[in-house]
Amino acid sequence: MKHIARTVAVLSVAAVTAFASAACTSGDGEAAAKPDKIEKIGLMVQDMSNPFFSAMDKGAKEAAAKIGATTNTQDAQLDLANQNNQIDAFIQQGVDLIVISAVDENGIEPAIERAKRAGIIVIAVDTPAKGADAVIMTDAVQAGEKSCEYLIQQLGGKGNILLVDGTPIQTIRDRITGCNNVVRKNPGIKVVGQQASKNDRASGLAVTTDMLTATPDVQGIFGMNDPSALGAVLAVEQVKAAGRIKVTGVDGSPESVAELKRTGSPFVGTATQNPAEMVRQAVEVAQGIIDGKPPAQTTILIPSELVTRDSVNEYQGW
């Protein structure tokens, strides 16, 4: 009987211990401590087929090498469920820092909160992510303004334009807002079509083709990123309108640089982003948080510059 009683007591203690341990890792438990140093970095990108995110991956590797850390880059393929699973995997792997370009800035919040409870620093890049410790992104309103200002300038302040929109994330909404800010200041300009692409060249081609079919009297097209803008270029050339329609984008990608240098292209300008710099700054901000020096502002905006045919040879690029 003593042996049985002792066994029951041991099992009871084990059960209580297991329950307490589970409680500490639940949503209601105390958060784990922040890391002492950054040794493992998890980078989460929206769509690796976009050269923008390849450049971001390169920046992550460079930033990690400087501090002796490792990186693990995950491609969401524009799927929120993938990003939720990737964050849970990073928690299990014990990463110290997650740098995320969120597919859905609100939908990803519960997963970010799980990561933070596990003691992981989370920095959003390119677009905000609710719950992140900070966000580093291009001044997207400024980028949209610069690109559309140049487009309208090239049209002489008069004409019909199309907007090639994208997925509904903050940075893309901001670029469209920037463009519309400029349109409102130019009464000779009219937006006659706006459709959302999937942020890539193929869908940029498809939606621009649809809009040009519906409204062929167009003089300019703004693509909210370079892949969609270059898709618009293909659509313009397919209808043999390269001589009368001009196109601008946002990114300053290597592909857009090549297009600016191509003779006869309707592509005339792009507002820059610096994806590698976003990640470098994310690592610096995370280190500051570890050192007890969080950023004064949790949203850090990187200025955008305009690149045209006239200035492309001076542009450093990605």
Give the predicted meaning of each segment.
Residues 2-7, 12-13, 17, 23-318:
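A residue-level marker of the well-folded mature domains of exported/periplasmic proteins
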